[in-house]
Amino acid sequence: MKIALTGGASGIGAATVERLLRKGHEIVIFDLRKPDVDCPWVPLDLMNTGSVDEALEQADGSFDGLAFIAGIPPRDDNAAACLTVNTLSTCRFIEGFLPKLKDSAAVVSVASRAGLGWQDNTPLLDELMALEPCLLYT
């Protein structure tokens, strides 16, 4: 099976790549850093929407699956980065990748404990999503 995998250069993503390769799957890794394994690699910076779009354009062929494993942990000073990487860019990449998936394909999205604290970010979400009008129409 041909599987696209984000976050495959380190951590859980790298371990997943190794296991899938041992089982004989073809893996295409999307990551900011070049992985240490011999697999096709597409640069992907989830902080940059242009990079997300470029990575989607570079994904050749059709895929049997997508494993979205990339993410960053929350810290006191990176709420906006967490929202961008772990939510907004995740959705952008997955939605953009759907046309490249075969009808029988599976999508797996891995989240960490970072997904548990999303409620703490609702003030930032409100600000970034501009839920209040900037001006009134009359």
Functional labels for PLM-detected ranges:
Residues 6-18:
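N-terminal Rossmann NAD(P)H-binding glycine-rich loop of SDR-like oxidoreductase domains
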Residues 23-36:
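Conserved glycine-rich Rossmann-like NAD(P)H-binding loop of the short-chain dehydrogenase/reductase
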Residues 36-50:
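Rossmann-fold cofactor-recognition segment
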Residues 41, 82-83:
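A hydrophobic alpha-helix adjacent to the NAD(P)-binding/active-site core of NAD(P)-dependent oxidoreductases
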Residues 67-74:
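Conserved NAD(P)H cofactor-binding loop of Rossmann-fold oxidoreductase domains
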Residues 93-101:
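Hydrophobic positions on the long internal alpha-helix
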Residues 137-138:
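Conserved small/polar residues in nucleotide/adenosyl-binding loops
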